[in-house]
Amino acid sequence: MVLVLYETAAGFALFKVKDEGKMANVEDLCKEFDTPDSARKMVKLKAFEKFDNTSEALEAVAKLLEGAPSKGLRKFLKANCQGETLAVADSKLGNVIKEKLKIDCIHNNAVMELLRGVRSQFTELISGLGDQDLAPMSLGLSHSLARYKLKFSSDKVDTMIIQAIGLLDDLDKELNTYAMRVREWYGWHFPELAKIISDNILYAKSVKLMGNRVNAAKLDFSEILADEIEADLKDAAVISMGTEVSDLDLLHIRELCDQVLSLSEYRAQLYDYLKSRMNTIAPNLTALVGELVGARLISHGGSLLNLSKQPGSTVQILGAEKALFRALKTKHATPKYGLIFHASLVGQAAPKHKGKISRSLAAKTVLAIRVDALGDSQDNTMGLENRAKLEARLRNLEGKDLGRLSGSSKGKPKIEVYNKDKKMGSGGLITPAKTYNTAADSLLGETSAKSEEPSKKKDKKKKKKVEEEKPEEEEPSEKKKKKKAEAETEAVVEVAKEEKKKNKKKRKHEEEETTETPAKKKDKKEKKKKSKD
């Protein structure tokens, strides 16, 4: 036997199909519901479960929209549909009913035609329920369902923040444009005022109050400017190099000043509104990064829910996509931060610590966004706790740098830096003080010293190689020093011997020249004359 489940605003109805053979011909099923009598021959009401109130109806319909049976529907089917085949309009609902209640469910074109026919003759198939009763029920349920959907819409509040931050950025651009226009326009008449007053709002207020610069000496600017700036303004107005302007020009300049002031007032109101909305919707995110940065992150992500699905690495560079893709294309270093760079925590950090702090802040920001988007609590305790942790980490990083600068780094200074002759072994401590080597005193020529330098270098290299190859056979430092001293003395003695030999040869040569006889000198002179002739 086939039973048809039909959902209405008044309750659930089960209809029994009298002639199941007609379901085979789908095209002719619609003809069976042309009249109430033919419809009664096709189906018959078996059971009806009425909703007690609107809240019960809303709960049941909300479950059906999700593809799941409500608690009342499960009880109704268990009581009236055991061992029967159930025809349903939603295949997903049929799968859940079959899995949980063990009731066979069908869903095909014939079932849809049956439901269409039942809908057309519903008030005739159920006695005591007319259109005048069903219409207000349907209207009330539709309104309740609309409110339910709006209540749990993920985009209902994000839109306000996205539009507010977008308008705030546009107002900043307009304010800057209008303020610069006022400065350029009024600068022809009073150019010195631009250097005296740097703030755009104060500049517009002063221009609106003063008008022509001649009036500056008679006016009181104490409500707008400080005493020193007011004195400078009045002094500059007397000796100004600007040109004269007509009253019509001043009228338009003052109207532009009114526009600047009205825009600045509205911007302040809009900022207060954005601040209140951010504290209500995303309190933890606001506690970590502030109202403006948090609102820009939500606007860039599309919504708070979409932003909560992003990992920390994506949130860290959100807003720097152009730089990221350029770096990937050119194979350079990728950016370390995007919109999160404007957070106060990143701004407080030193330049070399900004990357670390932005990475930590992005990780905590993602956690805060997920709590705000999916959590039930509306307080900002989690955001304040994470902010305190990040501030402690920042102080820790700065403290390490201060410790390195002041000399309080980890470990003690290595004594090898100050005494290179110290041995690294357990028995090798600081070597004894060096004594003056008297054997090294000698009068040597520059050439002999130069010739000795390469030989000494070679000897040192050979000794180093031997020491590296046989580290285990190292002798105590005192013996090595004695050997070095002996080698140096031997080298000096050899050089001294060579010098003595050279001096002896020179002396012999001089003696031979002095011992020559005058006869030999005459013979030499005669030989020279003959050679000339």
Swiss-Prot record:
Residues 401-433, 445-533 are annotated as: Disordered. Residues 521-533 have a biased composition (Basic residues). One of its GO terms (molecular function) is snoRNA binding. SMART domains: NOSIC (SM00931). One of its GO terms (cellular component) is nucleolus. Residues 413-424 have a biased composition (Basic and acidic residues). InterPro entries: Nop56/Nop58 (IPR045056), NOP58/56_N (IPR012974), Nop_C (IPR042239), Nop_dom (IPR002687), Nop_dom_sf (IPR036070), NOSIC (IPR012976). Keywords: Nucleus, Ribosome biogenesis. Residues 281-399 form the Nop domain. This is Probable nucleolar protein 5-2. The gene is NOP5-2.
